[in-house]
A protein has these predicted regions:
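Mature catalytic domains of secreted/periplasmic carbohydrate-active enzymes
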Residues: 1-173
Length: 173
């Protein structure tokens, strides 16, 4: 209670929450995404490779920017937030593949950020093969690796700010 009284905008996260816990805490799904929109806001935490920097991850390759974009769009359409980790090398720098990933994500966000920031769940979150597919979350998450396709569409809405404006629905493929 002290923390909330000190900073009412503070967010406390938890991994395994029941409906009562979700009234006070933000559900944090590790490396996973629910298959349906959630009534309460939630987040997934993931990384482009392993949680810690390693040459093995560098050699194996990281998630592509397109994979993370697909995840981000799916997460936002289900009332979620993406917490993305890009590990640093021991000297505090990023490697060349991480820098390329960051540049590609930056380009996508500059072009499409309007469909992410300030948006809300629309009356339907999506269409396509993955809408009907079951992808259960195990324990606290760990259901990453969904293969999105061009047939998977996700929807969000940005509500009008004034009475003269209209709501904008974004469909991302």
């Amino acid at each position: 209670a002290h923390s909330y009284n000190t900073d009412p905008e503070m967010v406390v996260t938890g991994k395994v929450l029941d409906s009562t816990h979700k009234e006070a805490m933000l559900w944090d799904i590790e490396r996973g995404i629910p298959d349906r929109p959630q009534e309460k806001p939630w987040q997934t935490c993931t990384c482009i490779g392993g949680w810690h920097y390693g040459v093995k991850d560098y050699n194996a390759g990281y998630k592509s920017a397109q994979q993370v974009v697909d995840m981000l769009v799916d997460i936002v359409s289900k009332n979620g937030n993406l917490l993305l980790s890009i590990p640093l090398k021991g000297d505090g720098t990023h490697d060349d593949k991480e820098m390329r990933f960051i540049a590609e994500m930056t380009d996508w966000m500059e072009q499409n950020g309007r469909s992410i920031y300030g948006t809300r769940v629309w009356k339907t979150f999506g269409e396509g093969p993955l809408v009907d597919a079951s992808n259960p979350i195990y324990n606290q998450g760990f259901n990453e690796g969904i293969n999105y396709s061009a047939k998977d569409v996700r929807y969000v809405v940005k509500h009008a700010r004034t009475e003269q404006d209209v709501d904008t629905v974004f469909a991302t493929i």
